[in-house]
């Protein structure tokens, strides 16, 4: 079992119960899923780009991503409906906890010029979204094997009712928020 999952059960959950005065353990916010999304607009011109993005995403997430396609044709971007324009992965369960552990302990500290995560990235319902500019911050990506540096979106969906609960939950996992 992942180290962070044990930490959630043993320390984070009881701390949140006392902090927010929950009457039941089931009211305590928990992380439901983590979604990784990589937009690959260049895939319209070159099909190989999508293969590289899928390979990188598979290495990072530990499971095969789903190719996302354009819903509408947009002449300005030279895309047609049904064109592959990105890929995404939804992590739940054990893989989610393992990814979260790698994100907090290894990937975030490797971000260049890092000054803390923005607190403004909560959506009002306790979910947190962050962007990563380089996929090379993850240890699974070998620097000499990548064709291009790509970024990705990471969305952490929680069962928190508001941003305060969501932030307290993520701070319990040592997320480095700006002060």
Swiss-Prot record:
Keywords annotated in UniProt: Ribonucleoprotein, Ribosomal protein, RNA-binding, rRNA-binding, tRNA-binding
Entry-linked SUPFAM superfamilies: RL5-like (SSF55282)
GO molecular function, one term: structural constituent of ribosome
GO cellular component: ribonucleoprotein complex; ribosome
InterPro entries: Ribosomal_uL5, Ribosomal_uL5_bac-type, Ribosomal_uL5_C, Ribosomal_uL5_CS, Ribosomal_uL5_dom_sf, Ribosomal_uL5_N
Single GO biological process annotation from the record: translation
Pfam families referenced in this protein's UniProt entry, alphabetically: Ribosomal_L5, Ribosomal_L5_C
Domain of life: Bacteria
Protein's job: This is one of the proteins that bind and probably mediate the attachment of the 5S RNA into the large ribosomal subunit, where it forms part of the central protuberance. In the 70S ribosome it contacts protein S13 of the 30S subunit (bridge B1b), connecting the 2 subunits; this bridge is implicated in subunit movement. Contacts the P site tRNA; the 5S rRNA and some of its associated proteins might help stabilize positioning of ribosome-bound tRNAs.
UniProt xrefs under PANTHER family: 60S RIBOSOMAL PROTEIN L11-RELATED (PTHR11994)
Quaternary assembly: Part of the 50S ribosomal subunit; part of the 5S rRNA/L5/L18/L25 subcomplex. Contacts the 5S rRNA and the P site tRNA. Forms a bridge to the 30S subunit in the 70S ribosome.
NCBIfam families: PRK00010.1 (NF000585)
Identification of the protein by name: Large ribosomal subunit protein uL5
Organismal lineage: Bacteria, Pseudomonadati, Pseudomonadota, Gammaproteobacteria, Alteromonadales
